[in-house]
């Protein structure tokens, strides 16, 4: 049992996802040349764990009823979101500020459409979640890449560099907080610097906070509205149950917009696109944002903390490899620059030698070229196996 009195989840359970239309497991051979028969899928950012029992019960209740109509009367769903943000993050969210989209990427696309024009620039601090650049370019906007600095092995901001790279046509910044793939939890001072930069340059700030619940002991995520309450007239915050509770297939997300004028613009674009809620996602989210869901998240972050410690210790003992310190997320960011190998060489050793599928760092933009991203949200035995395979694949460098 958890300390809150709920059944303890078994994250050590090995669940075979092959043959279930899993993007993570059923496409890795085609994309990475790693067979599911003996390979380890550590790329797509979903977890190999069952969601909390409260989520399972919500789906079972829907199935037992047997009618899957349009969703209506969202008061309970909105109350669950507000309860979660208040109790877990100390953030009081007005009901009228909440919009429901089909997920983070969909929410990003609507923001780009609603708040910029074709030919405008959108600033990204790279390396960063690769879907942002894709959405921006597909919308006919320009990606303004601003590489993050590295200080004492961690990513940091260089606002002076941002100032040199933007143009009068740069209209928006997308912040990843906590950061994917670098695992940073930005400090109050860092978030304040972002806010000040956006005010100075009249930018809309879209803050992707989808990993806000997956923060490790000793770190504290600060929602941007609390870090910089004076910028609410230019702020959009995106969150979701999908990452926290491993229900990405539900395709639902929350877009929280404090300012009424920005809400009007966002709502107009949503209506033009005919976007409405996924009833499965809303039922699951309502169940997840609960005391039982909170107990599950506490158990999850404790388990993931053990996985990251095991992975970091093992990988950092391999000559030439360095895992960036992970403060949040379950996505380890490993630098292979110390091997002296070309990108093709170290990727070949990981995929063909270690038989591991991991995200290629170059897809995350400038600064990611020497990295691979490894998903640690899997049973610990599999993490141990991955570390041992990497040790053998790069053993000749010792």
Give the label of every model feature segment.
Residues 2-12, 18, 33-40, 45-61, ...:
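PLP-dependent class I/II
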């Amino acid at each position: 049992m958890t300390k809150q009195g709920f059944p303890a989840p078994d994250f050590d359970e090995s669940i075979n996802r092959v043959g279930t239309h899993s993007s993570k497991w059923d496409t890795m051979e085609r994309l990475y040349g790693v067979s599911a028969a003996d390979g380890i899928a550590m790329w797509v950012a979903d977890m190999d764990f069952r969601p909390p029992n409260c989520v399972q019960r919500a789906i079972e209740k829907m199935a037992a009823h047997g009618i899957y109509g349009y969703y209506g009367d969202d008061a309970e769903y909105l109350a669950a979101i507000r309860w979660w943000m208040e109790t877990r993050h100390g953030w009081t969210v007005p009901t009228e500020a909440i919009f429901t989209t089909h997920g983070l990427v969909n929410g990003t696309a609507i923001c780009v459409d609603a708040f910029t024009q074709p030919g405008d620039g959108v600033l990204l601090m790279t390396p960063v979640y690769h879907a942002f650049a894709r959405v921006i370019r597909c919308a006919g906007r320009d990606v303004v890449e601003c590489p993050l600095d590295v200080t004492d092995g961690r990513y940091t901001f260089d606002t002076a560099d941002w100032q040199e790279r933007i143009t009068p046509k740069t209209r928006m910044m997308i912040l990843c907080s906590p950061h994917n793939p670098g695992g940073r939890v930005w400090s109050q001072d860092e978030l304040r610097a972002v806010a000040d930069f956006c005010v100075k340059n009249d930018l809309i700030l879209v803050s992707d906070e989808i990993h806000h619940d997956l923060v490790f002991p000793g770190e504290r995520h600060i929602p941007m509205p609390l870090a910089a309450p004076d910028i609410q007239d230019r702020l959009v915050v995106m969150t979701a149950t999908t990452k926290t509770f491993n229900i990405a297939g539900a395709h639902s997300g929350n877009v929280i917009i404090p300012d009424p004028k920005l809400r009007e613009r966002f709502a107009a674009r949503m209506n033009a696109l005919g976007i409405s809620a996924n009833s499965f996602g809303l039922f699951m989210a309502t169940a997840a944002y609960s005391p039982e869901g909170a107990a599950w998240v506490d158990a999850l972050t404790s388990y993931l903390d053990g996985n990251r410690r095991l992975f970091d210790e093992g990988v950092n003992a391999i000559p030439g490899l360095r895992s960036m310190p992970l403060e949040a997320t379950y996505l380890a960011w490993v630098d292979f620059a110390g091997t002296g190998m070309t990108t093709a060489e170290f990727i070949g050793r990981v995929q063909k030698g270690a038989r591991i599928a991991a995200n290629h760092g170059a897809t995350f933009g400038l600064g990611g070229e020497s990295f691979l991203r490894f998903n640690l949200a899997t049973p610990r035995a599999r993490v141990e196996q991955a570390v041992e395979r990497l040790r053998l694949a790069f053993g000749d460098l010792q």
